[in-house]
Amino acid sequence: MAEAGTGFLEQLKSCIVWSWTYLWTVWFFFVLFLVYILRVPLKINDNLSTVSMFLNTLTPKFYVALTGTSSLISGLILIFEWWYFRKYGTSFIEQVSVSHLRPLLGGVDNNSSNSSNSSNGDSDSNRQSVSECKVWRNPLNLFRGAEYNRYTWVTGREPLTYYDMNLSAQDHQTFFTCDSDHLRPADAIMQKAWRERNPQARISAAHEALEINEIRSRVEVPLIASSTIWEIKLLPKCATAYILLAEEEATTIAEAEKLFKQALKAGDGCYRRSQQLQHHGSQYEAQHRRDTNVLVYIKRRLAMCARRLGRTREAVKMMRDLMKEFPLLSMFNIHENLLEALLELQAYADVQAVLAKYDDISLPKSATICYTAALLKARAVSDKFSPEAASRRGLSTAEMNAVEAIHRAVEFNPHVPKYLLEMKSLILPPEHILKRGDSEAIAYAFFHLAHWKRVEGALNLLHCTWEGTFRMIPYPLEKGHLFYPYPICTETADRELLPSFHEVSVYPKKELPFFILFTAGLCSFTAMLALLTHQFPELMGVFAKAMIDIFCSAEFRDWNCKSIFIRVEDELEIPPAPQSQHFQN
């Protein structure tokens, strides 16, 4: 009984829905019937005759004014549409049509029927888009005092944006501070220094923190749960103060290296002490975590100093030791520093070994990993690659692998080839990058352009094949080939990360929709005709009659038909009729 009642209700519901779907036709015929019945009381015939009389008395100037007014309104709508498209990257009319008119016309039903099946996929894609739009610390970032500031002194331009430096300040507070900093005077001063916006105030605070390292303090060291001892120790020198001075005050890489070595001595002592006490409470555990971050940062920057000063083998050894000592600290992306140093040494076998470990599907990709893999594949075939020969005989297996690797890299970050091929000028890389964005492309090309130039024919192979990637992903914002769809947020984030004098690369390139161009041309042509008709009514009348006579003439129709037949013959390539041959006896 319950099932029968449910079936009856479903049928009744479907009948009601069907009746409401076609109810507008009933209303339409009902309105027509009312108009026919009330035609005499409403004096419809008299009103129609009055309207026709009014239209007959209108002069051509009225129609010209009406046309000009409509063209003006259309032009204003066009200007607003163009402004909205430039600002938000989408058409206002299209957005209103999709968002508001489509649900009224029943377009939501198709999407809602699949909503339950695609809910998990949507959540996964949302999580992926959030992770791809995350801003990452640039593993190859330069030194502020020795490199960024020197660029400012020479050119007068600021290579870093306020947003980028603010992110760096947040990173420093996360890595170099903890809740127990107020117990040590030097760390308390540095905690305030990392929040300071003025560079000179930060440097002064770092010097002040180093001046109080001779203060003695009583440090309580618990041995067992039932007893404690008290011992007097000298407060160690503040390692984070040396870090700040090396980053911002040192004007050369050599000076920065000296300060980082002093920071290493102080940071190593703090790390060993906190390592022994890390299990005695959450406070000591937080101190050990902070000291670990400080030590890893110092060793990594020392390796980068050695790389800058030409001691590349020493830098490679320091990076390998650091990765073995702290294998879980992947947030610094030390393997990207190692890849760049190994490419400088032309140790391509070691580069391949590092890629085999980090070019994994479970790890986040980067332009360094994708383009380094493409460079190694291209190195095997680039010296003998020729576009003409490849078009004649086809691509070999090795060449196909190299082209696929280039397509994979270009799909991940399509901005890099323009910098590697020197189609766009490079600037100093920012301190933070957005993966798959223009900022990451600048950071990669700034350090790896020399490695691509060193491999003979690699840039030629890249030049011949990189644009073929876009044929495989005609709609990159909706669907990718090997990666997730390209994130929409890259342009906005890159504009905040990169300086204003740099022209941000945009992908995919926004093009004006066809209907905007068509509307612009139609409005312009109509306004021009209205203006000419108003100024020269007789001449435009003669011109209009002449055009009508031309289009209505028999010669024009014959010429049009002949042109159509000639075009069809050209497309079909109809051969001429064979000539008859006569044989003589």
Swiss-Prot record:
Keyword terms, alphabetized: Glycoprotein, Membrane, Phosphoprotein, Transmembrane, Transmembrane helix
InterPro entries: ST7 (IPR007311)
PANTHER family registered for this protein in UniProt: SUPPRESSION OF TUMORIGENICITY 7, SUPPRESSOR OF TUMORIGENICITY 7 PROTEIN
Gene this chain is encoded by: ST7
Positions bearing Phosphoserine: 386
Transmembrane segments: 15-35, 62-82, 512-532
Record keyword Ion transport present: no
Protein name listed in UniProt: Suppressor of tumorigenicity 7 protein
Top-level lineage group: Eukaryota
Residue positions the entry lists as glycosylated: 47
Entry's family note: Belongs to the ST7 family.
Mode of membrane association: Multi-pass membrane protein
Cellular component terms (Gene Ontology): membrane
Cellular compartment(s): Membrane
